[in-house]
Amino acid sequence: MEVFDLGAEAVFDPARHVEKILGRIGGGDVTVACWEPGQTSPYHCHPDATEIYFCFQGGGEMRTPERTVPVRPGGAVVHPPGELHEYVNGPARSVLFRVRYGTDMRTFVRSWAANPEWQARAEDRAYFNPG
């Protein structure tokens, strides 16, 4: 059994959201993800992993190519393998509990509009623009 106190594990950074892996269990990991107001994740996917977010406090919006949904305390969002998504935090600090599991945790980033320093890696370009 693994037990976590998400409030005590929370770490915030004014420059970028923080993803702190709390443990690796079986074929996945569990993470506390901490967001300052207005922070945005990269627009990304995990081709071989399912990613589940549970909102502990705060909230914002989760976006996919198909839709945008509110993320509120007590709510959860499940991204199947390969689904492009990004999280946009709302006006308050947020703490999300993330569970990822699958055969490979690799992340491919399509874009990161909120991070002007971000540059695509060769593997990101190859994944999104094959051939």
Question: For each predicted feature, which ranges?
Answer:
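Conserved hydrophobic "DFG−1" position in protein kinase catalytic cores
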Residues: 32-34, 54, 89
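A short, N-terminal "cap"/entry segment at the start of jelly-roll beta-barrel domains
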Residues: 1-29, 42, 109-131
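A generic "binding-loop/recognition-motif" signal
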Residues: 37, 48-49, 67, 83-84, ...
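Conserved short histidine dyad/triad with adjacent acidic residue
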Residues: 31-46
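Ligand-binding loop in jelly-roll beta-barrel domains
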Residues: 61, 81-108
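Glycine- and acidic-residue-biased ligand/ion/polar-headgroup-sensing regions
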Residues: 48-50, 54-60
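Short acidic-glycine-tyrosine-enriched beta hairpin
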Residues: 66-82
